[in-house]
Amino acid sequence: VDLALLNPGGVRADLAPLDASGAVNFGQIYSVQPFGGGLVTMTLSGAQILEVLEQQWRTNGQQALLLPSSTLRYAWRGSQPVGHRVDRASVRLHGLPLDAARDYRVVVNAFLANSGDGFEGFAEGREQALFGLDREALIDYLSAGPPVPRPIWSGVYASSHSAVLARAMAIGFLSTP
């Protein structure tokens, strides 16, 4: 998988470590992801990924910013009209420019895969397959990796731990550049 995306409503709390060791418990994990929803892999073209990124802003003034895995970087401009906010030249996947004609493997939760929060572009994904539960992926990620770091910054994400959660969705499925 090249990219994982999570809707902000899928993260219900910060995943803050209990102490300096970085330990977290199941209750905290459950607070972060109470739904226990399925994870879906799919194939999207680069053009479809750009379309999904643009769907973060609506003509009615609402927005729902996606939480991407660390493999995706892009800039957007709120001063641009809806449908033209993503700076397409800035979009990088694994540090390389996104190729609109190329196919990419993407993982999202089942809510997004079914056009949740108005992200209709995910319904166009090809080769969709359900492969596990989001909470279990987070537990596997936390069990296999280093302790949860304390947040250092916040930006587009609800918290820096939202990025950890998006990466956890794709644990074992992200390809290397």
Describe the function of each predicted region.
Residues 1-177:
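Catalytic centers of hydrolytic enzymes
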